[in-house]
Amino acid sequence: MRSLLAALLATALAFATGACAASPGGTQPPDVRYGRSVCDGCGMIISDKRFACGYVLASGASRIFDDIGEMTEELRERRPADATVFVHDYETTEWIRAESAVFVYSGDIRSPMGGGLAAFAGRERAEALATRYATTTMTWEQVMARAGTPVPGH
């Protein structure tokens, strides 16, 4: 009876642990503990939600960054085919998928590593910031195409 109870407890624990892990296919954003988690690119503490970002692989493994520009450089170099990429909305700080975000790129955007990128869930707010900084909005594909190029104004 005791061994049956132990087996049932072990099985329940395995299911509970699996439910808390990053889901396969990267459907959930990576786990970032602001003020404690370390950027996988530069080793700095990730503290500004507006620029925190990361990607999750189909295996559930993830990488986190303190700056969108820094992450795009790594993605360009590594080219993981199964990465689901997440960024924060610059104003609401909610996680959003990079492929659906609208980006603003400017040297006037002071991000932790100087990447100059801000992401938005909606076009209207992105265009307002772009107008403020006399620039245009970008798609994720455009951001990746320019990854590694110097930020204007730096």
Q: Positions of the model-derived regions?
A:
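Short, flexible, mixed-charge glycine/proline-rich loop motifs
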Residues: 28-35
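Bacterial N-terminal signal peptides that target proteins for export
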Residues: 1-8
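Thiol/selenol-based redox catalytic cores and closely related redox-interacting motifs
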Residues: 83-154
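Sec/Tat-exported extracytoplasmic proteins
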Residues: 43-46, 75-79, 130-133, 137
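C-terminal motif of bacterial Sec signal peptides marking the signal peptidase cleavage site
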Residues: 16-19
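Mature extracytoplasmic domains of secretory-pathway proteins
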Residues: 64-96
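Post-signal-peptide N-terminal segment of Sec-exported extracytoplasmic proteins
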Residues: 35-72
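Bacterial signal peptide processing site
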Residues: 21-23
